[in-house]
């Protein structure tokens, strides 16, 4: 079953209430569509990054890592085409003077018509049919004007044209300008990739949908350099491989789809792009992009060779040929992935209570590799004989995993607190533990319980948290 917009709202509220996500600068009224990640949120982010890095970089012998600067020489963005063509068409409402992306509103209109059984080409939707989402005025729009999405900054003591720089709108260009450095120092040759995780910035005119579209965001990108005749094959490979990554980490396959960009909507560098989309259930278009896998051809290395004067071709000694490699780029949004994992994991079911009845419980059925907290140690009560020994066990386990200790409140309520943040295992230290030197370990999803010797708890978790 696909998530609904009400579940998205519920998950957003849970994220804020449990400290996964806070509005940035909240005590000053907040910044629109800017978010800070709290104690649990930062753990979840780091776990997603760790799984991506392991799958894309360290588990392979044909990919290496890189961490490039956020502020690159301005010439990089001139050469890449971003200064000239990294634009979105904006229209302004003549009544309230709010600006919106024309293509987003056309797509939303077409999606609404589709729900009525009417097929409409978004590009053919006349702006006279579109109602302003801010003031409700219909069809009163200016002609579209291009709006460059790069954020400017100035280096140096005064703001001059010479000091003009940009905050990177993508991490990819830092990889391309280091292509020759990596080939030389890492002794790599095509097919090989360079992976990078880092922040990017885009002056989105209509950010929104919680953490889905923001001006500051993190990307997990990899540029895979190949011999040109093999590009199509490698493109298919990375589409399938990246789709499977989400499924392996617990996303319901029914909530994922592949969307191939029409030729007329491809980016200036692309010969073909396929998006991995998740069915968030947004109003208008329920699908949202998690990751794009593009065949960037040899555009990037060729243009940087031309503008820098540095040869970025590759000489294949075995075949005595020289070529400019094509690039296959899987580019994922970290916080979009985080949002999808949360929405897909959110579940409401029932659990037995101490009175013999059942209570509603909220569970995040996150893959244990992603769960912010791996285990919680819960003494049956706050007792002088129980809490110190339970704390000692938590301290021991904390050497290997992120482990919480909680002795406040009824044990059932403490279970619920851990369930709704996705903790896979709760370890109860009770009065019997003082005699049999064992604890009860409860599994999150099935709520099954197992008695395990205290000396074996670490091994018990190690088997079940492998890969975390």
UniProtKB/Swiss-Prot annotation:
Main localization of the protein described in the UniProt heading: cytoplasm
Keywords carried by this UniProt record: Aminoacyl-tRNA synthetase, ATP-binding, Cytoplasm, Ligase, Nucleotide-binding, Protein biosynthesis
Catalyzed reaction equations: tRNA(Gly) + glycine + ATP = glycyl-tRNA(Gly) + AMP + diphosphate
SUPFAM superfamilies referenced in this protein's UniProt entry, alphabetically: Class II aaRS ABD-related, Class II aaRS and biotin synthetases
EC number, as in UniProt: 6.1.1.14
Domain of life: Bacteria
GO biological process: glycyl-tRNA aminoacylation
Localization: Cytoplasm
UniProt-listed CDD domains: GlyRS-like_core, GlyRS_anticodon
Top-level enzyme category: ligase
Binding of substrate, residues: 101, 170, 217-221, 329-333
Summary of subunit composition and partner proteins: Homodimer.
Biological function: Catalyzes the attachment of glycine to tRNA(Gly).
Similarity-based family: Belongs to the class-II aminoacyl-tRNA synthetase family.
Protein's name in the database: Glycine--tRNA ligase
Species, as recorded: Mycolicibacterium vanbaalenii (strain DSM 7251 / JCM 13017 / BCRC 16820 / KCTC 9966 / NRRL B-24157 / PYR-1) (Mycobacterium vanbaalenii)
Gene from which this protein is expressed: glyQS
